[in-house]
């Protein structure tokens, strides 16, 4: 398995420790499958959510992040606390990092401090569309 680090340069020691521990309980084939899955994970893109009122929607987002290999999910809890619904996340919350932030400003400052560009959805016509957004320009949230 490669060093668990992605193109944005963020090491993932917690995940490496989990896999090392679990490797003693699985076959070599299963271990190889797990290593391939980890090698495909990324921190180059991360997902943020803010004051999620419906925990089932936020919990579904956790599952989507895990399914698409997004290693981090950020939750702003200024008005609503985020607690994953175990019936919806189905254990996927154990494989991604959920980072909680008290305010949107703190989240943005933290991500920018780590070199992320901040991207948001907006109904404005003059902004970039997904087709014109430069994914290769650096990590984004």
Q: Where are the language model's segments positioned?
A:
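Post-transcriptional modification and biogenesis factors for structured RNAs
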Residues: 1-141
């Amino acid at each position: 398995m490669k060093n668990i680090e992605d193109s944005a340069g963020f090491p993932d020691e917690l995940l490496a420790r989990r896999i090392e521990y679990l490797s003693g309980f699985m076959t070599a084939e299963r271990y190889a499958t797990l290593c391939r899955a980890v090698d495909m994970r990324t921190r180059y893109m991360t997902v943020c959510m803010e004051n999620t009122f419906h925990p089932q929607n936020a919990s579904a987002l956790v599952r989507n992040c895990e399914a698409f290999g997004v290693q981090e999910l950020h939750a702003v809890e200024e008005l609503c606390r985020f607690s994953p619904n175990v019936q919806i996340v189905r254990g996927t919350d154990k494989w991604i990092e959920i980072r909680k932030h008290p305010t949107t400003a703190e989240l943005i400052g933290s991500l920018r401090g780590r070199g992320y560009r901040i991207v948001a959805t907006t109904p404005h016509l003059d902004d970039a569309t997904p087709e014109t957004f430069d994914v290769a320009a650096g990590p984004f949230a």
